[in-house]
Amino acid sequence: MRYFWVLLISLISIPVNAEIQPLKVITIRIGTIVPERSSWMNQIYRFNEFIKKETKGNLKFIWWTSGVAGDEPEIIEKLKRNELDGAGLSGMGLGRIVSDVRVLELPFLFNDYEEVDYVRSKISPLLSKIFNSKGYELIGWVDQGFVYFFSKEEFRDISQIKGKRVWIWKEDPLAEALTDGFPEVTPYFEKVTLLKKILDEGMVDVIYFPPIGVISFQLYYGVKYVITPPITYGLGAFVMKKDVFDSLPDEYKEVIRKGADEFFPQFVRDVRRETEESISALNKFGIKKVTLNESTVSELRNRMRKVYDGLIGKLYPQYLLTQVLSTLAQFRVERK
């Protein structure tokens, strides 16, 4: 009987107008070098709104854009120090977590997006597992589009680029390896966040960048020519720290996966479409398209194949390069 009265008094003591406490809002901090008002971020914010709506505002992604969190190597360091929970990265940043991923960005590897999509789909499960083993959750792939040379002066063959100062993304081992295939040029190593500055100040003559990025980063005033064909494919992805992702309620994890499955493929399609539109739009800024001689393209392909082999054991294992090349060759045969 005594316990009955204790229970009764406890129940009576609860105010009738007591409110149920709302769920704690979880904030995920994400860093990227992508400019705030770019097409890339416009796509990402659609994904953000989906997450917010599906979780009734209880899960929020806060993006530190425009390099506020630093260049990609600095973003990686912030992830390690738990100052960030996730990141939107290019292949350069992804490669600092899992260097194997750079096999998808080898120069003159892919001819079109169909080849990209096919090969990436075949090795994506393996790469996801490797990211997991490094403490990261691969949320979804995105695109930068194909990457082109942009130059202050016209060139159609290798002899015309001799002595030119070419920007190389600082601390990017793949970009540095490219200089082995271009002994004629003078590399200028600098952060991508300072690229506009050194371009405007005349410190470099040639850069490599996706067309949509040239517009987003406002690099068009510093160059006059876009050189075709593209030299490589630009990879991108959204990753989260695995411990952060694993700590989320299961329903939130499912929302993130659902959002990635729904929005990221559209993100990729839009970026690819806008890449083509960007090349046309750059004409309005006086940037002319120049095509390399066929003999030059052939020579560059041969040079870059030596770069592929030189990166075995440094960026990726032999078996992975073999798998990518054989998968690509098989796709080309089947598509004929």
Regions found by a protein language model. Give the residues of each.
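Positively charged n-region of N-terminal signal peptides that target proteins for export
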Residues: 1-4
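N-terminal signal peptide c-region/cleavage motif recognized by signal peptidases
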Residues: 13-15
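Sec-dependent N-terminal signal peptides of Gram-positive bacterial secreted proteins and lipoproteins
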Residues: 7-11
